[in-house]
């Protein structure tokens, strides 16, 4: 079953309105997104045991999922602020991927 990406955007709009976050500037939300991407990277490194932080206040087990949720939340918020139709974006992105080649190890 396919869930519309726009539904997640609408839900994020509702939460932002409820929390009073609708007046945030696009550049502020962008900076918050990049901060969360860094936190996701750190959580992935912890999960993959690339490095180990000491003195943590909480267990790192669910951090990847939670940080990824934060990243998606800010992406949905930006898509709302920029009036992006996420379902259309995903279809167009899929078309682009058909021809894109990566040399990944």
Segments the model singles out, each with a brief description of its role:
Residues 1-68, 72-105:
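Flexible "arm" and connector segments at domain edges
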